[in-house]
Amino acid sequence: MDNHNEVPMSMSVPWASAASVTCLSLDAKCHRPCPSSISASASASACASDSAAIATTKLRHIAYTQRCSSRLTMLMTVLLLLLPLSFTPAHSCGPGRGLGRRRERNLYPLVLKQTIPNLSEYQTGASGPLEGEIKRDSPKFKDLVPNYNRDILFRDEEGTGADRLMTKRCKEKLNVLAYSVMNEWPGVRLLVTESWDEDHQHGQESLHYEGRAVTIATSDREPSRYGMLARLAVEAGFDWVSYVSRRHIYCSVKSDSSISSHVHGCFTPESTALLESGITKPLSEISIGDRVLSMGSNGQPVYSEVILFMDRNLEQMQNFVELHTDGGAVLTVTPAHLISVWHPERQQLDYVFADRVEELNYVLVRDPQTGELRPQRVVRVGSVRSKGVVAPLTREGTIVVNSVAASCYAVIDSQSLAHWGLAPMRILAMLQSWMPAKDQLRSSQTEGVVSRAEQQNGIHWYANALYKVKDYVLPKSWRHD
């Protein structure tokens, strides 16, 4: 009877490995009755010997399965990362041809003396105010990074390598632009004639002195290309672009300190989520595997498993947006985070960046009486600076925090595209949950071993990879820059 009960159990799980089936058969063997012809002492000795051998064999099978799990995890990650390259959606085409495909929308060159945006360079909507000149002996000099991109030519007239130094944001945008230039004009490379300047060759108020500006041209010095070069610079994400002269283009960016508050999307650690057990926990205490209240694709509340943390840092200081509703709910979230906004006139639910939610907009809030998600009007939008960031990712891609429905995603202005981009992590989590040795290994952990959530400090490697690649595959209008 025991054997008949065990076989269907293994057959009911078609993905169970041979190791798990072997362990079941070994368990059955371990508990078989000893023959009556054998003496009691011999029987005990034989059974003890069998038990020790079986325990050793089981541990070997568990270790083998764990190795297979690790290899499968690595293989699936590689395959799933390569999979999107084979069918890039039309809306994912970025500057130039974008992953081997020509862009499907027309880009119009700038005209001489045109600037984008049409604002003063030092306004908040452009590159922002000056923060002070950086010299070699300044504390901020260590924040400048060299750019050794082989696809970029640096004139470096001074011979000091100063033209290679710039802020991290400037380097990031310049590398994207270099990629676009090569795709737009094969055989032509981006030329940087000036970056960080320590010789005061510019006006008194110049972002060159802070490493936040570059003067660029093309390697062939063809003036007819410069209008389109300026347009490509806009698409690459520069915060202010000016077709200042027929000889070059001027570009600048916001300071690294001013944009650090919204490069990723997170909640405050003290914000709370409701678990399926009915317990409300701060996000700082949520662990991978917890099932928390989320919102399904139909707008109804569902409980969804936390599969990873896209960002988790309890010490980092960050700027947040505060959304207050007429029902008393308060959501504190980073500016680039996507929030579900209900449009009653259209009976439609959209996802909007938190810093673009306005008063009189409606957000979905959990009704404590019925448990349903109901629209509540936003009555005040504020800002606060607080310590710590936490960004859990659920299988649904949504989470209800402080009773307000929000996305798990940020930076990209599309809930569906962001959810599609994290599909490899959901598949990976599902595969890992099928591994037969996982529960056995977890049960062997001692109480002193901290959880994966407690061990993580910083941005998840996959989320960070997506953030870095977004500028190459998405147009600027799809990004929170």
From Swiss-Prot:
Its EC number is 3.1.-.-. Transmembrane segments: none annotated. GO terms for cellular component: cytoplasm; extracellular space; nucleus; plasma membrane. A lipid is attached at residue 93 (N-palmitoyl cysteine). Ca(2+) 1 binds at residues 157-158, 163, 193-194. Ca(2+) 2 binds at residues 158, 194, 197, 199. CDD domains: Hint. It is an enzyme of class 3 (hydrolase). Belongs to the hedgehog family. Interacts with shf. This is Protein hedgehog. It comes from Drosophila pseudoobscura pseudoobscura.
